[in-house]
Amino acid sequence: MRTQVMQCCCLTAVALFLFCSMPLLAQRQDILLNNNWKFRFSHQVQKGSEVRVDLPHTWNAQDALSGKIDYKRGIGNYEKKLFIRPEWQGKRLFLRFEGANSIADVFINRRHIGEHRGGYGAFVFEITGEVDYGKENSIWVRVNNGEQLDVMPLVGDFNFYGGIYRDVHLLITDEVCISPLNYASPGIRLIQDSVSRQYAKVRAVVDLANGNNAGQEAELSIRLLDGEKVVAEQKQKLSLAGKSSVQQELTFEINNPHLWNGRQDPFLYRAEVSLWKGGQLADCVTQPLGLRYYRIDPDKGFFLNGKHLPLQGVCRHQDRSEVGNALRPQHHEEDAALMLEMGVNAVRLAHYPQATYFYNLMDKNGIIVWAEIPFIGPGGYDDKGFVDLPSFRANGKEQLKELIRQHYNHPSICVWGLFNELLESGDNPVEYIKELNELAHQEDATRPTTSASNQMGELNFITDAIAWNRYDGWYGGTPADLGRWLDAMHRDHPEIRIAISEYGAGASIYHQQDSLVKTVPTSWWHPENWQTYYHIENWKTISSRPYVWGSFVWNMFDFGAAHRTEGDRPGVNDKGLVTFDRKVRKDAFYFYKANWNKQEPMLYLAGKRNIMRSQQLQTIIAFTNQPEAELFVNGKSWGKVKADPYAILEWKNVELQPGENEIKVVSGNKKIPLVDSFHCRF
């Protein structure tokens, strides 16, 4: 009898889970509206000038990516016809845009319903009272990526692609629902008040809305699920006044929680929040919950769940060749896979909020995230990143609220970034940064703030941690300068938490040289071997200083920058470890893979694209995470060499023969034989 009861309980729990997880049964529908839009520029007013496009879409996939400095920055119009079913009357309808750059005005049946100013956050408008039920309706979106003085960012060393470049959704809910209108957040904020290995206390703050004129009696419940097992559950009855929006809190506790532990164990609970009305399920939203605790020590660096974790990171711009910023899921997945292959455990998503899909991938794979707003200074260019206008200040605060509220529940996010390379001249941003820092703490008391600086000044002492963009050995100086600078900074300011937010050098896979000669960064010659040398020397410096809480290679991927005229082509910043099309991993990628990815045995010969050698005596370099390897040149052994502490193998004065040569390296591990080779001519 007991077995039957247990089986019945299990079946009931599974049925309830399925009931709450299926959008139709849960009274919430999420309909993707990406297909069959008509697009035209603002000057194309003649009928028939539209072209059919599917979203995500940018109108700069050709001009900006070809290095055209004056790529189109203006107004594009998107229109879609949508049949609104008669049975949706009595429901609530919302349009959710994941991203449109940078100003979007939305019209329903040619009536203006709202404007969003900012190109990287999601936004939601309710259209319940604007549509005609049982008829075809028009959705018209006017997008403007032109320069504005009151919308962040004002400047940037990257392309400002125009368009609706992320997904668009139609959300259909009951009149009583978990509201999507709180800065386009999921309507649930999971606040980790206390987390340890023994105990966790979490508050769920839920945004509720009643669209009916009459008051409603309801019940709010939350279940924390580990697979299909209910770990914690809370319920609360409530009364919602007519036409009201309220926040409700539910608190739950967990003993001996399973922690989210980065790459080692990125475990996620599911927090399932349900709203019941008259005994019927009115709405249900599920969010990830990764329980973790962490700190940044000014002397010892970053600690996750009580254990030291050096953050071996990269920066990521969201664009790629041919598609610009209009990425599909497979593009995000490929980027994440390349990062995982290299052994990355942290990423700075620069210089703006990126797609929710990518944050989800970081949660699932245990990669720690630095997320930031697009408050960007001019860097090495003659421009301004801050204007002291009330409208600009307000826009920055709105974008910060969007970032935090939309992405609060992602356990991968551990720091909020507030600015990049600002100047304390002209309109001085220091007081405004203090306001942003205070706002970030008001919005989220659980995460520290940080920023990326490139100069000394008061702005470096505002956020909880600070990082610097350093290019020692690329934009002047030598790689050895980084160590001297870090040590002096730590000595003079032992209280601050120091990271390296950017370091990198340009490289073309088509530019090869025998000798190691530093180039001019702004020239058309970006030899790959200098990038490799740069990263080897900089990583030696960073990895030997535990007080550096994180370091972020600039950049994981080449990215579009239409104004750049350097490297092997205009319009591309080639500091990536992987090419713009994601097809080629540069030599420096494999250097980091050998150092950071100890799980996947690897052996790689550097310089294999240098197929025309000018000198008979060569230095052959390989990277491996194995103890040693043996070099063969034209079948002759040049001996076994043990890998140094930085996973480097080096054979000096290796003699080539005139004509064709085969260079081959073989791992000494017989259980896992590894071989890499290439051919070159002398």
Spans of model-derived segments:
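Secreted/periplasmic carbohydrate-active enzymes, especially glycoside hydrolases
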Residues: 1-18, 24-351, 361, 366-369, ...
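Long, contiguous interaction/targeting segments characteristic
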Residues: 100-175, 519-592, 597
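Substrate-binding/catalytic cleft of secreted carbohydrate-active enzymes
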Residues: 333-339, 346-584, 588-592, 602-614, ...
